[in-house]
Amino acid sequence: NPLMTIGKQLSETLIETLKISGASAREKSIELLDSVGIPNPEPRLDAYPHQFSGGMRQRVVIALALAGDPDLVIADEPTTALDVSIQKQILDLIKSLCKQRNLGVIIVTHDIGVIAEIADRVAVMYNGQLVEQGKVEQVLQKPKHDYTKSLISAVPSGDQKLHRFTV
């Protein structure tokens, strides 16, 4: 919410989900921001979203997702609009948090590179239907469905001649 400080958003979430006091929520908010790699987290609680870079805003969203101490997080396009170096940092953060917290993550994305980087398994949906699923290596190396094949062929590689994509 662009009209609320980061601290207000985190505290509100913590108070509602964990039923803790405002003071405890503030301390937990600082811990959450620190855990997602936001430097100097305490003064950042009083900042508004527009005062953060895209990568930092994404870290705050991850902190918000972790506020209720979930077993599973669903991340919808978590790296969209981030440059490739920040994207890598966010993916590394997600992987690290999964290990530290024994956390499951479902990532919704169209980015084959993100899937290859972070996923163990992949499910491909087309027109609202599950059309293919399996281990990432299996699906990416030997896709069975035409939609999966077209997604993979849309990823540029340095060893191909340029060609027009079909729609």
Predicted regions and their residues:
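A short, proline-enriched helix->beta-strand linker immediately N-terminal to the Walker B motif
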Residues: 67-71
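Short, glycine/charged-rich "phosphate-handling" switch motifs in NTP-dependent
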Residues: 121, 133
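Short catalytic/signature loops enriched in Gly
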Residues: 39-42, 135-167
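Helical segment within the ABC ATPase nucleotide-binding domain
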Residues: 88-101
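Conserved ABC ATPase "signature" region
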Residues: 24-43, 152-153
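A short, surface-exposed alpha-helical micro-motif characterized by mixed small hydrophobic
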Residues: 115-117
